């Protein structure tokens, strides 16, 4: 059997696989903010990125390793393809972290070998021990993944795994790269590895999975029952295509059903010892932070963190919950950090109260960023009686956590009505502070604003999504707008919140456009799609 640490290790890949979601691109400060919150959440390993992809990715991993990694903190991990250049860059990026890991991989399925890598099985059996050994010479903690393991020939994969462990891999990861496998099959796959890999007891077994068939979490739980002790997951389940296994769902399944899972760890079913090291009360704020910074909206009926996860419409359900929450709720909302504000913030609140609440929400702002956020808070407080946590989150993500600004919005003015053709006047400033103004007509005020902005910026793009939602309740609620732009097949998200949704739409468009322009400055490789040309 594989090594058993006595609990499940949570390997968070929000900053690597999660960021590969269309439109979820993050800048360095946003990645750092998420990494710091992941550390508060208690994840065991943070996969901070793919350092070889670009200089920007390298710097982000390096900064996280320096500022988030610690003797008592999470292991900081970087991804590397099975190539010396990738592995060397990864080792250099994670070097500042006291506890660090190199995660290298190569595909093992015949379809990937033939059509992507154009390599034989013999080639892979030669590359794996060489590259794992090289990684092991640079770091004491090495993880190896068999990409597309779910569609690989088991006997060949056993051979690859055995060679990786012999070369120094302390963790073996089994990815369901395309979300193909079913729970029973995944359990059998883990059983087969434990049974047929002679040196598996020298390594921890890990799993990674995508949600293309909606089975990722179920697959992982079956893998845990059969010996997997590391779960690679993301906050809110974000990731390529249909996403990854959701961290919050996995953790709470193991928490709520601990008595069921305990025997699979050799424990008494009544053992109160948690099966993960996650601080569950940090789940909600982590979910909201990731949603705000990526622009990836959490669906209302999403388990654990969706807006409706603890809502009851039926009268019968409401009556039962009022008498005893356990009648219809298997999770106490407070367990995942869903609680009312302890401090009521309004126009008389000072900087210290705002800073304290932001710190509780997971935001560690610089003095300059705090000044910007506080100025925005005071502006909003003049228009709203009370400021909620969601308002604060919207302020920070809009005002502070934004990409380098090439364009800044200075003026939005619209005229519309039953007898008027919607007209927008917009003024923006470029990075040199030069202002330009445009006027445009549209089918509505938002359409007119977007047309004016498009004419001012001269950046080609297609607006593929516009959505607006109320951040809080009441007539004075903030309206949060999300806009997605597409260019050359890539998607860029922008979001903003304001009591005036037209202003929010204009700022969201500018934010998306700044992300688009920022991305043009860096040319990033994709760890799976870009093939290593030579192992040099």
UniProtKB/Swiss-Prot annotation:
GO MF: 2-isopropylmalate synthase activity; acetyl-CoA C-acetyltransferase activity; manganese ion binding
Entries under InterPro entries matching the protein: 2-IPM_HCS-like, 2-isopropylmalate_synth_dimer, AIPM/Hcit_synth_CS, Aldolase_TIM, LeuA/HCS_post-cat, LeuA_allosteric_dom_sf, LeuA_bact_synth, PYR_CT
GO cellular component: cytoplasm
CDD domains: DRE_TIM_IPMS
Keyword annotations from UniProtKB, A to Z: Amino-acid biosynthesis, Branched-chain amino acid biosynthesis, Cytoplasm, Leucine biosynthesis, Manganese, Metal-binding, Transferase
EC number of this enzyme: 2.3.3.13
Any single biological process term in GO: L-leucine biosynthetic process
Subcellular location: Cytoplasm
Cofactor: Mn(2+)
Annotated metabolic or biological route of this protein: Amino-acid biosynthesis; L-leucine biosynthesis; L-leucine from 3-methyl-2-oxobutanoate: step 1/4
Signal peptide segment: none
Residues that, per the record, bind Mn(2+): 17, 208, 210, 244
Domain of life: Bacteria
PROSITE patterns per UniProt: AIPM_HOMOCIT_SYNTH_1, AIPM_HOMOCIT_SYNTH_2, PYR_CT
Family that this chain belongs to: Belongs to the alpha-IPM synthase/homocitrate synthase family. LeuA type 1 subfamily.
Function: Catalyzes the condensation of the acetyl group of acetyl-CoA with 3-methyl-2-oxobutanoate (2-ketoisovalerate) to form 3-carboxy-3-hydroxy-4-methylpentanoate (2-isopropylmalate).
Full protein name: 2-isopropylmalate synthase
Gene: leuA
């Amino acid at each position: 059997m594989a090594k058993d640490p006595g609990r499940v290790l949570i390997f968070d890949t929000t900053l690597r696989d999660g960021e590969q979601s269309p439109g979820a691109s993050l800048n360095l400060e946003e990645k750092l903010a998420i990494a710091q919150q992941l550390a508060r959440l208690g994840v065991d390993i943070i996969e901070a990125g793919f350092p070889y992809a670009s200089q920007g990715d390298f710097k982000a991993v390096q900064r996280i390793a320096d500022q988030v990694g610690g003797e008592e903190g999470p292991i900081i991990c970087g991804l590397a393809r099975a190539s010396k250049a990738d592995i060397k860059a990864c080792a250099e990026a994670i070097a500042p972290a006291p506890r660090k890991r190199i995660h290298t991989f190569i595909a093992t399925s015949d379809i990937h070998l033939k059509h992507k890598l154009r390599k034989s099985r013999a080639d892979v059996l030669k590359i794996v021990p060489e590259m794992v050994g090289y990684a092991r010479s640079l770091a004491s903690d090495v993880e190896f993944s068999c990409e597309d393991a779910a569609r690989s020939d088991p006997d060949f994969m056993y051979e690859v795994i055995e060679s990786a462990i012999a070369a120094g891999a302390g963790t073996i990861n089994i990815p369901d790269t395309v979300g193909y496998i079913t729970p029973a099959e995944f359990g059998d796959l883990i059983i087969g590895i434990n049974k047929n890999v002679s040196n598996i007891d020298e390594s921890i077994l890990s799993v990674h999975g995508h949600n293309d068939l909606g089975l990722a979490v179920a697959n992982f739980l079956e893998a845990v029952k059969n010996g997997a002790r590391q779960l690679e997951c993301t906050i809110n389940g974000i990731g390529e295509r249909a996403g990854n296994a959701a961290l919050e769902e996995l953790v709470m399944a193991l928490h709520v059903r601990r008595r069921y899972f305990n025997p699979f760890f050799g424990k008494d079913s009544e053992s109160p010892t948690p099966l993960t090291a996650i601080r569950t009360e940090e789940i909600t704020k982590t979910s909201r932070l990731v949603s705000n910074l990526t622009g990836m909206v959490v669906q209302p009926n999403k388990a654990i963190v969706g807006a409706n996860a603890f809502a009851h419409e039926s009268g019968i359900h409401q009556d039962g919950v009022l008498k005893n929450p356990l009648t219809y709720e298997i999770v106490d909302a407070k367990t995942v950090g869903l609680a009312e504000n302890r401090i009521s913030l309004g126009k008389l609140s000072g900087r210290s109260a705002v800073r304290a609440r932001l710190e509780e929400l997971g935001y560690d702002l610089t003095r300059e960023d705090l000044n910007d956020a506080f100025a925005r808070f005071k502006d909003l407080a003049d228009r709203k009686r009370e400021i909620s946590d969601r308002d604060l989150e919207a302020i920070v993500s809009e005002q502070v956590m934004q990409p380098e600004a090439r364009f800044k919005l200075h003026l939005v003015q619209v005229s519309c009505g039953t007898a008027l053709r919607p007209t927008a006047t917009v003024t923006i400033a470029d990075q040199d502070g030069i202002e330009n103004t445009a006027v445009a007509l549209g089918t509505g005020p938002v359409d007119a604003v977007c047309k004016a902005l498009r004419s001012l910026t001269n950046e080609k793009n297609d607006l593929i999504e516009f959505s607006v939602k109320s951040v809080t309740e009441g007539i004075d609620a903030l309206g949060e707008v999300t806009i997605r732009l597409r260019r050359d097949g890539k998607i860029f998200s922008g979001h903003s919140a304001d009591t005036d949704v037209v202003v929010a739409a204009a700022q969201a468009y500018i934010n998306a456009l700044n992300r688009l322009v920022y991305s043009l400055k860096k040319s990033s490789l994709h760890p799976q799609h870009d093939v290593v040309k030579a192992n040099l």
